[in-house]
Structure formats: structure tokens, C-alpha cells
């Protein structure tokens, strides 16, 4: 797990995610073919899934540009007149993301994108039956400039490890998309 001393700076995260969104758009057909063959769905549905993924990452980029922190006027009493408070957003720590099978590209994008945008490394556990999209996402993020250790993929059939990570005190956030059965196993 990373420490606060080696988080990625905001400008670098924006640049990486912007490149990643562009890569998704540029490789739209290739990614849709992967999602279609992996998930057994029609190609037009997979194209929509890929487009939504690119839009989701671009939304993360725009949110980062607009929301880096706040300056809050403090005039609640005479002693605080003319003073302001500054807030700065900081990463909460590593994110563990467990995802479902039905939209393997889009669901993982909507977990990984916000985690990286927030400055948090992410450990992803894809569905056992649809891991290829997750591996492709991790590969593309590294190609876009994300350090390799920032997006780790747990191999299929490692739900026991994911369950252990849920209770690991070093994990800052847990994201789960999936069935109630798996949710109960993870809790």
C-alpha cells in the first residue's frame, strides 16, 4: 500500500485520466469487440458501454479541474471577521473494487476512474467470468501514464483475498457492484 508521501499530484492525475479517456475513444471498436466477446452481448450494446466508459472518465477529469478544494469565508462571529478557511481534498487511501459481470468494462471504469481521480490506488477484483476487460483497463491506464502499482487486478477466483482486503485497516474505501450473494460473502 502507498503512503501519503507518494500520492500522484492532481495535475498528473488529470493528465493521465484525460489520456486514458482519449485512448478509450480511439480504441472504441477494439474495446467493444472485447466486451462483446467476453460478455456475450451484441456489439451495438458493447459500443454503448465503451462510450459510457469514456464519458465517465472524462467526467472524472472535469470534476478534478473544477473541484480541487474550497475557500470558505468565516464571518460567524466578531473574532472571525475577515478570515477564511481553506479546504484541500486528500486521498483516503487504497480502494478495493469488486465488480460484476454484466457490464465488465463500464462497471470497472466507474470504480477505477473515481478512485484514481481522488488520488487513491485501486485493487480491482473483476467477476470470474469476465476478467479480460479489467486487465485491458489496467493495461491502458499504465499506458496512459499511471504507475503500474496504482491499478492492481486480482485474478479470478480470489474472492477470499478480496474479503480479507475489506477488513484490512489500510484500505481507505471499498466499492462493490454485484449480487446480493457476493455482497453477503464480502461483508
What kind of feature is each model-predicted range?
Residues 1-68:
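Glycine-rich loop-to-alpha-helix module at the N-terminal edge of alpha/beta enzyme cores
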Residues 69-187:
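Rossmann-like NAD(P) dinucleotide-binding subdomain of oxidoreductase/dehydrogenase enzymes
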Amino acid at each position: 500500500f502507498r503512503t501519503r508521501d507518494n500520492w500522484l499530484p492532481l495535475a498528473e492525475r488529470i493528465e493521465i485520466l484525460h489520456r486514458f479517456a482519449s485512448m478509450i475513444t480511439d480504441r472504441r471498436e477494439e474495446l467493444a469487440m472485447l466486451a462483446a466477446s467476453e460478455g456475450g452481448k451484441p456489439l451495438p450494446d458493447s459500443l454503448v458501454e465503451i462510450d459510457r466508459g469514456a464519458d465517465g472518465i472524462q467526467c472524472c477529469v472535469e470534476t478534478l479541474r473544477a473541484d480541487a478544494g474550497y475557500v470558505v469565508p468565516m464571518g460567524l462571529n466578531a473574532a472571525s471577521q475577515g478570515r477564511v478557511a481553506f479546504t484541500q481534498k486528500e486521498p483516503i487511501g487504497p480502494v478495493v473494487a469488486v465488480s460484476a459481470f454484466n457490464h465488465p468494462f463500464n462497471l470497472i471504469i466507474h470504480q477505477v476512474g473515481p478512485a484514481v481521480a481522488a488520488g487513491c490506488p485501486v485493487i480491482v477484483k473483476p467477476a470470474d467470468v469476465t476478467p479480460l476487460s479489467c486487465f485491458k483497463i489496467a493495461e491502458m491506464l499504465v499506458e496512459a501514464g499511471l504507475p503500474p502499482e496504482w491499478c492492481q487486478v486480482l485474478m479470478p477466483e480470489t474472492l477470499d483475498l478480496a474479503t480479507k482486503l475489506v477488513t484490512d485497516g489500510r484500505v481507505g474505501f471499498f466499492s462493490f457492484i454485484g449480487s446480493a450473494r457476493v455482497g453477503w460473502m464480502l461483508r
